[in-house]
Swiss-Prot record:
One of its GO terms (cellular component) is extracellular region. It comes from Sus scrofa (Pig). It is found in: Secreted. InterPro entries: Serum_amyloid_A (IPR000096), Synovial_Prolif_Regulator (IPR052464). Residues 99-120 have a biased composition (Basic and acidic residues). This is Serum amyloid A-4 protein.
Length: 128
C-alpha cells in the first residue's frame, strides 16, 4: 500500500506543470468525470462492439482538460487494466488478451488527441 501511494505521489509530482497544483487537480477531477461519463454512456447504450469507442472518447475528453486530465486518464486506465488482469488470474474474466491490447490502443488513441469516432461502431445512436 505504501508503495502504491508513493507511486501515485511521484506521478503527481512529475505530472504537475507550471500552471500550479490547483489547476492540475481541477483538471484531474474533471478528467475523471469525463471517464465516468463515457463509462456510464457505454453501459446505458449497451451497444455491441462500442467499448473501444467509449474508451477512446473518455480518454479524449479527459486529455482535452490538460495535463491533469491526461494523468487521471492514465491512472484510471492502468488501474482498470491491472484489475482486469487480477480477474483473469483468478479465473473470473473471459476477456481475451487481444481485446485488452485493442482497448489499450483505443485509450492511447483518445489520450493523444485523435478523433475517437475512429472507433465508433456503425449504427450507434447519435446521442453518444
Amino acid at each position: 500500500m505504501k508503495l502504491f501511494i508513493g507511486l501515485i505521489f511521484c506521478s503527481l509530482v512529475m505530472g504537475v506543470s507550471s500552471d500550479g497544483w490547483f489547476s492540475f487537480f481541477k483538471e484531474a477531477v474533471q478528467g475523471a468525470s469525463d471517464l465516468w461519463r463515457a463509462y456510464w454512456d457505454m453501459k446505458e447504450a449497451n451497444y455491441q462492439n462500442s467499448g473501444r469507442y467509449f474508451r477512446a472518447r473518455g480518454n479524449y475528453e479527459a486529455a482535452q482538460r490538460g495535463p491533469g486530465g491526461i494523468w487521471a486518464a492514465k491512472i484510471i486506465s492502468n488501474v482498470g487494466e491491472y484489475f482486469q488482469g487480477l480477474l483473469q488470474y483468478l479465473g473470473s474474466s473471459s476477456e481475451r488478451e487481444e481485446d485488452q491490447v485493442s482497448n489499450r490502443r483505443a485509450e492511447e488513441w483518445g489520450r493523444s488527441g485523435q478523433d475517437p469516432d475512429h472507433f465508433r461502431p456503425a449504427g450507434l445512436p447519435k446521442k453518444y
